[in-house]
Amino acid sequence: MAASVCRPYVRSLPGVMPWRSSSCHYEYTAMHHFLGSFQKLPFEPFNTGARKIHTAPVRSLFLLRPVPILLATGGGYAGYRQYEKYRDQKLEKLGLEIPPKLASHWEVALYKSVPTRLLSRAWGRLNQVELPYWLRRPVYSLYIWTFGVNMTEAAVEDLHHYRNLSEFFRRKLKPQARPVCGLHSVISPSDGKILTFGQVKNCEVEQVKGVTYSLESFLGPRTYTEDLSFPPASSRDSFRNQLVTREGNELYHCVIYLAPGDYHCFHSPTDWTVSHRRHFPGSLMSVNPGMARWIKELFCHNERVVLSGDWKHGFFSLTAVGATNVGSIRIYFDQDLHTNSPRYSKGSYNDLSFVTHANKEGIPMRKGEHLGEFNLGSTIVLIFEAPKDFNFRLKAGQKIRFGEALGSL
């Protein structure tokens, strides 16, 4: 019965052999050719009368469509950001502190895996390439327009004078452009933006509001106290107490961020004596305020140069922190310092004492004296000891210029 029903349909298929007498063999041969025809012929739409239903390969169902996925991802992220904004507004109305949104360990590790040291070295080499005379003005003008550089303050305003980007970044200022305040004991060592300032509490320094880093991790262990004019504290004292050498004093800090358009040199913030230099090879992550709010202990991860010594009120230190494309930190009186060098490995530090048999005090620095320079914008961190009545004359987030007062007694 099955053979008689299928015979009219199967005979019409091309390539089907004549039927044999055996019904079993007949059914097998017909069905074999019936199925084999689908491998030879392209798929045709089945006509169902009013409409056609087209078949498609199964693999096309699994093809990723980037535009809808990107739109869905972007919409989800935008919605999440709106939720965070709404939540922060609610917390602000209730008078509650908004918790900082810190990067996770894997996010920090992923960022540190980017070869920023190698990229910064390549950027440094590029900065040394001499530009053709006709190209200098358009290149420097674009940089001036992008970062808001005030060239009227430069000692040389002619853009053709600067042979390469490095010379332009390290341009000198006119003497009258940055008058040094003589009334206050501590001045700003550079142009920039005040991120944080205040007392150091519980051996933690404020990176930005709500985000801190370890004082000991930042400065390193006190293994060089024999070079300074005061003895080390006992081991049972906290690290902070080891730095505070006089009774009744407190430890203070101030963080200044230098943007790419700022004056890149830094100066002595007070009259003091530099006794020791410690160089920490490290990462070169961005140190802009947004990253400082996102990555905890950012300054401890990055390459930095710590200059420490003492001033009239006790311990004083200035730390130059490197950043992306700012692997070059130069200290004018330290010819042995070579930052972002492949011979140094992360996680170590290199010490140099300026106290010798011939010079038992170190290197004296006068307030406002040239101290060093960055290749591009970065960060300066001051940590110093002062009496309890020391007052900062600052506001968080304010712009400041070299020579202006930071605080006074």
UniProtKB/Swiss-Prot annotation:
Post-translational modification: Is synthesized initially as an inactive proenzyme. Formation of the active enzyme involves a self-maturation process in which the active site pyruvoyl group is generated from an internal serine residue via an autocatalytic post-translational modification. Two non-identical subunits are generated from the proenzyme in this reaction, and the pyruvate is formed at the N-terminus of the alpha chain, which is derived from the carboxyl end of the proenzyme.
Entry annotation: catalytic residues: 191, 267, 378
Single Gene Ontology MF annotation: phosphatidylserine decarboxylase activity
Residue ranges, Mitochondrial matrix side: 53-63
Cofactor(s) in the UniProt record: pyruvate
Residues with PTM Pyruvic acid (Ser): 378
Keyword field contains Transmembrane: yes
Keyword Membrane: yes
Enzyme class, spelled out: lyase
Catalytic activity entry: a 1,2-diacyl-sn-glycero-3-phospho-L-serine + H(+) = a 1,2-diacyl-sn-glycero-3-phosphoethanolamine + CO2
This protein's pathway: Phospholipid metabolism; phosphatidylethanolamine biosynthesis
Transit peptide location: 1-52
GO terms, biological process: lipid droplet formation; mitochondrial protein catabolic process; phosphatidylethanolamine biosynthetic process; protein autoprocessing; regulation of mitochondrion organization
Main location group: mitochondrion
Site residues, Cleavage (non-hydrolytic): 377-378
Catalytic activity, EC: 4.1.1.65
Topological domains annotated Mitochondrial intermembrane: 83-409
Function recorded in the entry: Catalyzes the formation of phosphatidylethanolamine (PtdEtn) from phosphatidylserine (PtdSer). Plays a central role in phospholipid metabolism and in the interorganelle trafficking of phosphatidylserine. May be involved in lipid droplet biogenesis at the endoplasmic reticulum membrane.
Family: Belongs to the phosphatidylserine decarboxylase family. PSD-B subfamily. Eukaryotic type I sub-subfamily.
NCBIfam families: PS_decarb
Matches recorded under HAMAP family: PS_decarb_PSD_B_type1_euk (MF_03208)
Name of the protein in its database record: Phosphatidylserine decarboxylase proenzyme, mitochondrial
